[in-house]
Amino acid sequence: MKKIIWGIDLLFSTSLVAGAHTCCHNSAQKCGCKRGYYTQYYGDKPELIKEAIAWAESGVWRNGFDKAKPHSSVNLADFYLQYQKNPQQWQALFDYLAKTDLLSIPKGKHKIPGSDLVVSVEDSKNEPLEKRRSESHNKHIDFQYVVKGTERFGVIDHYSSTPNCKYRPDVIHYDYDRRKARFYDSNPGEFFIFFPRDWHIAKVATDSEDQTIRVIVIKVDYKD
């Protein structure tokens, strides 16, 4: 069942994007299109999607890390392509996660041995959606693994979102339509990866009383 979910979610996401591209190229408001654009489009590359799903299911990327799998929202085609282009950083990342006690390590920033990656261990609290900012990055990929508590992540629609500030390395923020945003709650058995086309919101309050979280954040270089 886990394997099926991975594949269906990616294909569903890309089919929505395909509909949005067909309906309108510039703005959903111009044609009344209800579909959105949430992640990099690979719907015209079915073989790549199949290859990426098979690769993700095989676990060859794990490098000893078996505590979690990609959340169903993760764009597996992006994950697959970026891993092939930058294996050293990804291998170091998963090796670190496999060998580190993520619950007891002190909060703060730590260098990942054998790489130029830095892990940020954050003990934090979720906040109401209106207090959280959306963002995306051009040069880095956000790897986020919530090891304690539950964090709600949002992904916003490109067509109904507009930048509300100047780009400054390496982040830009957006005004967006909350009704078109998608939200996902974390669990310790899954991690999230936000690629440049995944405009996202982090640390959104959930429906539970306890909003305390520990999240592992690693910024991986994005390779064109």
Features from the language model and the residues they span:
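Bacterial Sec-dependent N-terminal signal peptides
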Residues: 1-43
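A short, N-terminal "cap"/entry segment at the start of jelly-roll beta-barrel domains
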Residues: 35, 41, 49-120, 131
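Short connector loops at helix/strand junctions that flank enzyme active sites
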Residues: 112-116, 136-140, 146-148, 213
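Conserved short histidine dyad/triad with adjacent acidic residue
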Residues: 119-136, 151-161
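Short, conserved beta-strand element in jelly-roll/cupin
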Residues: 139-151, 157, 167-172, 219
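Double-stranded beta-helix
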Residues: 162-185
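Conserved metal-binding segment of the jelly-roll/cupin
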Residues: 185-204
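A short hydrophobic beta-strand segment most commonly corresponding to one strand
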Residues: 191-193, 210-224
